[in-house]
Amino acid sequence: MKLFDLTGRKAIVTGATRGLGRGMAEGLMEAGCEVVVVGSSASALSVAEEFRSKGFACHGLAVDLSEREQRRAGFAQAVELLGGHLDILVNGAGIQRRHFCEEFPIEDWDAVLEVNLTAAFDLCQMAGQQFIRQNSKGKIINIASMLSFFGGYTVPAYAASKGGVAQLTKALSNEWAGKNIQVNAIAPGYMATEMN
């Protein structure tokens, strides 16, 4: 008996070409889930091909999540690749910029908040709308951080964005629980990934 069986489920995982996002995408596929691997470059296509060569049901999609119209079109395309149905969204995409607080460029602040927080909300909203249209339960997993709860050094935008993700998750969870949409966040500690 499999304790974790997602056969027939369909998921979108952002930030899925490397690091934690890639590991989560692979874990979902190992449990039987069909996954759209979303990355910021064409590497998403080669990662999807690699997963397909292992026998997984996987699609790749290159989407610049910093561009609002592109991420909305990308979400629609991902749902289409999944046959018009979605069960799970994993918001794993994130970027990092490091500067001392007194020197932190506002352009870097905007870039980090756009990808880490605004895109996460936008994708949650689109997933929520999709779940409601389908009249089916849905799962959203946001990737927060230990920096959601304490500051850190030279990472004010990242800390602010991940604090926002933690609170956004609570707000969505409160509002959508009655619609059978479960919204949770995972707050990993420091990980030795390419981003860090």
Give the ranges of each region predicted by the language model.
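Residue(s) in the substrate-gating loop at a strand-loop-helix junction
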Residues: 145
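Substrate-binding pocket helix/loop in short-chain dehydrogenase/reductase
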Residues: 100-101, 105-113
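Conserved glycine-rich cofactor-binding loop
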Residues: 17-18
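Active-site helix of classical SDR
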Residues: 124, 161-164, 169
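Active-site loop immediately N-terminal to the catalytic Tyr-X3-Lys motif
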Residues: 102, 150-156, 178-179
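Conserved glycine-rich Rossmann-like NAD(P)H-binding loop of the short-chain dehydrogenase/reductase
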Residues: 31-46
